[in-house]
Amino acid sequence: MARPYICLLALAAMLLLGIATISRSRGLRDKAHQSAPRIPSQFSQEERVAMKEALKGAIQIPTVSFSPKELNTTALAEFGEYIRKVFPTVFKTSFIRHEVVGEYSHLFTVHGSDPSLQPYMLLAHIDVVPAPDEGWDVPPFSGLERNGFIYGRGTIDNKNSLMGILQALELLLIRNYIPRRSFFIALGHDEEVMGVNGAQKISALLQARGVQLAFIVDEGSFIFDGFIPGLKNPFAMVAVSQKGLINLMLQVNTTPGHSSAPPKETSIGILAAAVNRLEQTPMPNMFGDGPMKMALQELANEFSFPTNLFLSNMWLFRPLVSRLMERNYITNALVRTTTALTMFNSGIKVNVIPAVAQAIVDFRIHPAQTVQEVHVLATQTADTIRTSPLASTCSTPSTCSHRASASCMESMRESQSKPTRGK
């Protein structure tokens, strides 16, 4: 169940568009970059209420993507009108260019005062996956608030980011903010179904214009609270790479029959055994010298003894930390390629033994592995002698760009410099 903190929009505003944050130093962090906020970051009670209501309203618009050719276009059009109403300053500011791309996606170009600086891009998406009413405490498109949480499809994926970005820009503009560095805001309408008419068309448009970006900030990770045992405070995990994926279809073909005289093995039984092997044989743990290790080292002083000792001396305790990361399903996903059986299809009648059984397994590929490597391991584990791997959707994991990270840090430091104020 998606249950983000109500103040997530405010936090997104501060993090994404540079309303200065003041971090607590324990002696391990450089204090040189800590300074007074360039623009006051306090929100009035009226603004806080408006943030909540804006997110609730966005959740109530059922912008569902079922397939690349089956979208709720009525809701997508309604959402376009909704953001115009909720964020009027964004749409009327002279140095912001707004374009509709692919009918329902939105591209904002925010022109900065220094054109020599390379621009960056903030990403979010409008569409959500289908949400059957079953399993929800409240209707999935109600946007209801209970006990400090807002419920509904899109509260985490990904209308929280979308509304947070636009809310941040709206509030900054009201405070007479003009950025030094130009940036883009791209809001796709079909991200959940591969983004063919949204993200891909926005990308093609910017490529045709010769735009080169310093870095991109996408929907990223969550605010973790209680997921890592021993961590005393909530923390925001900044994702610096993107997992790849393979949606691998497995199929078993056998001779059909009648349930009154079943064979020793059936298509369903053979396939069930294959996917069970995949679930019981996880991909290798890739915890090593990458950003996950660096993040834990930075968090070391937030833990009590002896965890802080382990994390501060990773050269000695890395194998132990690696095993501990596997024990929690959230942190386990950070150290390996994950395996998730998401679809299983077979059978037409209760007394007929089906000839065909199909399953789709979703692998989210760790950046330290390749699509080919995961495909080989998966097919070997699934026993391809009796289980045929068929067509699959895949995308390559992104690499960690040190240059992009440096540009991102430079931009964050710019946000703490002397403000440029406009009319």
Regions found by a protein language model. Give the residues of each.
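Zn-dependent metallopeptidase/amidohydrolase metal-coordination segment
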Residues: 380-383, 389-423
